[in-house]
Amino acid sequence: MSEYIDEIAIKVSSGNGGDGATSFRREKFVQYGGPDGGNGGNGGNVYFLGNNNLSSFKDISQKKYFKARKGGNGKGSKKNGKNGEDIIIAVPLGTEIINIETNKLICEVLKHNEKHLIAEGGKGGLGNAIFKSSKNQAPRKSTSGKDRVSFNLNLNLKSL
């Protein structure tokens, strides 16, 4: 007989944004190469997806922490970092998602393939090529990626 789980507590975290790069163009016979640092990639998001083939939280009960990937760092030659991979958590229809810290209902999953963004990934940092201007033609400034967002959640399955 299969196990039926209708309430579960989990932690979800989005991914950090990647850092922007500080880099300058260096080539043979190019004496003064300008700034060419790329931007960092965005961190991965965490989504909940309604699935009418599921009837309990048995599939996700073994894993208590879901973390999306970090965005890649920028590189020279204006190469932007790769965006972090998203995580999609399939839940049965009728799932209530409640933030444990605030005890507030975030959302309800009521339809098949209904997708809810729960934790948005951090924004990627800017490379020094972005900060180039007529007054500052060789900026040594780049920004770090934004931090991730984490939530402790309680998932309740209500009968439909």
PLM feature spans:
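Conserved P-loop NTPase architecture
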Residues: 1-160
